[in-house]
């Protein structure tokens, strides 16, 4: 019979990272907030789906606010105080997520829109007929 392995303490140790970058990817269906340090190593992340929303509710501004709040709380536990924010996508939760990061106690130094815009690249999908 296999012996149970012993668990050795918490796997994630607390770091002291004062500045970082928050990437907010906001689509029509979901909002994903990822907070990384200046090197690019991810410190915390949250999405509307991981925050407990399902289906069409994931695309709402309130779901984006909850996701940003969860990610910010975990980043503050790691010692984060200042953020640069990179916003990507056309979703409804863009501004709400930025406001939630500010409301959680993080100081935002820069907001940049990094939504990829094609210079007439790939053909878009056909229009929906409802």
UniProtKB/Swiss-Prot annotation:
Keywords, ordered alphabetically = Ribonucleoprotein, Ribosomal protein, RNA-binding, rRNA-binding
In terms of InterPro entries, this protein maps to: Ribosomal_uS11, Ribosomal_uS11_bac-type, Ribosomal_uS11_CS, Ribosomal_uS11_sf
GO BP of this protein: translation
- PROSITE patterns with a match to the protein in the record: RIBOSOMAL_S11
Instruction: List the Gene3D superfamilies.
Output: Ribosomal protein S11 (3.30.420.80)
- Which cysteine-cysteine pairs are annotated as disulfide bonds in the entry? none
The yes or no answer to whether the keyword RNA-binding is present is: yes
Which GO cellular component terms, listed alphabetically, does the Swiss-Prot or TrEMBL entry include? ribonucleoprotein complex; ribosome
Mind telling me which SUPFAM superfamilies this protein's record contains? Translational machinery components
Q: What does this protein do?
A: Located on the platform of the 30S subunit, it bridges several disparate RNA helices of the 16S rRNA. Forms part of the Shine-Dalgarno cleft in the 70S ribosome.
- Describe the protein's quaternary organization and the partners it interacts with: Part of the 30S ribosomal subunit. Interacts with proteins S7 and S18. Binds to IF-3.
Q: Record's PANTHER family? A: 40S RIBOSOMAL PROTEIN S14/30S RIBOSOMAL PROTEIN S11
HAMAP family cross-referenced by the UniProt entry: Ribosomal_uS11
Q: Which NCBIfam families match?
A: PRK05309.1, uS11_bact
Family of this protein: Belongs to the universal ribosomal protein uS11 family.
Name of the protein in its database record: Small ribosomal subunit protein uS11
Q: Which organism is it from?
A: Microcystis aeruginosa (strain NIES-843 / IAM M-2473)
